[in-house]
Amino acid sequence: MVQNLPVKRLTHDNLTIEGYSRAAVQTYWRIPELKLGFDLGGQPWDFMGTPTWIVSHTHLDHIAALPVYISRRRMMKMDPPRIYLPEDAIGPAQQILRQFGRLDRSRMPCELIGIRAGDELVLSRELVVTVGAATHTVPAFCFVVWQRRRKLKLEFQNLSGDKIRDLRLNGTEVSEEHRYPLVGYLGDSSPEGLDRNPDLLRAKILITELTFLAPGHRKEKIHKHGHMHLDDLVERVDQFQNEKIIAAHFSTRYHPRQIEQWVDERLPDRIGGRLELWL
């Protein structure tokens, strides 16, 4: 297998998280079981098989591999991918792809779909993604992937199968939708992204940026530029209901040993063993 970029993996329950994220370098994630990826700052070779991607914002470390991904799928005779982008980015992205097509003398077949806060992206009968507003220096979004199931309404649960069938035949809606948050994704954002989107804190797995950790950094400046500090996690530690919390997008000024030391000083139990540092 070709390994052109770093990829780390974590499996929890029935979901696999794969990817890499370092601030100003590149960010890319995918969940193979959901056939879904987040952000296209880089494109590991085997990630091209994932047909649907959602881009949180348009800084280059989150979108630079857009033409590479589309071109590879065309070259390998795969179906055109579906890519969700901030709606203001659709026009510029189309222009960029046209110019890369001219340079490469090839087509760039894909479906680009604009998103805004409040949207619901239907991936399948079982999966839907809700879009929330993040806070960054460019328009940015966060996402929750929900599993959808239909269950018999409470008032009909004691009825026989024949009676339920008759109700259905008479046009009565006997079931209702239940949603279960599987994965939350917060790309670049100040802590307002968490505060405004509490469903992120309920997802089975949360992937969140944690760009800054050093005690001496000024949090107000960090927040102004749309990022988070370790203190922001510590202040919200009682709010996390997630089974796993993946912290990533660390600043390149830090050595991995420094990151682990600062986290262990402030969160010695790693939030009950649920916190994973993507180093």
Residue locations for each model-derived region?
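Short internal beta-strands
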Residues: 80-88, 207, 246-247
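Conserved beta-strand hairpin/beta-sheet module of binuclear metal-dependent hydrolase folds
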Residues: 1-51, 141-145, 151-152, 175-186, ...
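Binuclear metal-ion centers of metallo-dependent hydrolases, dominated by the metallo-beta-lactamase
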Residues: 107, 111-119, 192-279
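Active-site-proximal loop/helix segment associated with metal-binding centers of metalloenzymes
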Residues: 127-201, 205-214
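Active-site metal-binding loops of divalent metal-dependent hydrolases
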Residues: 58, 88, 187-189, 210-211, ...
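Active-site metal-binding motif and surrounding structural segment of the metallo-beta-lactamase
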Residues: 41-86
